[in-house]
Design a protein with these regions (language model features):
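Short beta-strand-centered segment that lines the nucleotide-binding/catalytic pocket of NTP-utilizing
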Residues: 30-48
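Conserved catalytic-core segment of NTP-binding enzymes
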Residues: 91-168
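Structural motif
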Residues: 8, 84-88, 108-110
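Hydrophobic anchor at the start of a short beta-strand
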Residues: 33-35, 85, 131-132
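Conserved NTP-binding/hydrolysis module of P-loop NTPases
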Residues: 49-65
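Phosphate-binding P-loop
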Residues: 1-4
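Switch II (G3) loop of P-loop NTPases
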Residues: 58-62, 77-95
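Glycine-rich phosphate-binding P-loop
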Residues: 7-30
């Protein structure tokens, strides 16, 4: 049994997964929590994508292919982890890519709608992941916590690249 968790951050496209992953990782670093972020989607994003000027990002970003070799490499790395992992997953995994989730232990779900959360909840349950949080993402509505146990549920706002995120959901 793997002693370290691998928490997939999952949700539909453009729901704020990468921005939330970045801010969660920054918060964990400030708390002195050793961890590593695995970008399990070849979309060319990473911490640099959050920190670099937008014009530079447009020039440098290089989307890769979601090939079987990429999926195999991600699965291998997840299986041999030596630290807790945050796994930034793509928003539209195809069935052959879902094997990545079999290497994970937990899920943090984020979506702009209840339907998006339900879709990803089914995916997480199908792969035996323990759901830690279900977060509704909005650009302008205030943050709120609906429930803190057994699953953190609530709303987070302002998950926009290059903007600071703070609030009770983070």
């Amino acid at each position: 049994m793997q002693p370290f968790p691998a928490v997939v951050v999952g949700g539909p496209p453009n729901s704020g997964k990468s921005v939330l992953t970045y801010h969660l990782s920054q918060w964990l670093r400030q708390q002195g929590v050793d961890h590593y972020v695995v970008r399990a989607c070849p979309d060319g994003e990473g911490d640099w994508y959050q920190e670099a000027p937008a014009q530079q990002v447009r020039v440098l970003r290089d989307k890769g292919d979601f090939s079987s070799a990429f999926v195999a490499a991600v699965c291998r790395d997840l299986a041999h982890r030596h630290l807790p992992l945050i796994v930034d997953a793509g928003g539209r995994p195809r069935p052959e890519q879902e094997i990545i989730f079999d290497q994970c232990t937990h899920a943090l779900l984020i979506a702009a709608s209840d339907e998006g959360l339900a879709e990803w909840r089914q995916l997480a349950e199908r792969h035996g992941l323990t759901i830690l949080a279900e977060v509704r993402s909005t650009l302008s509505e205030p943050d709120l916590v609906d429930a803190s146990a057994p699953i953190l549920r609530g709303q987070i706002h302002g998950l926009v690249r290059q903007q600071r995120v703070a609030g009770p959901m983070l």
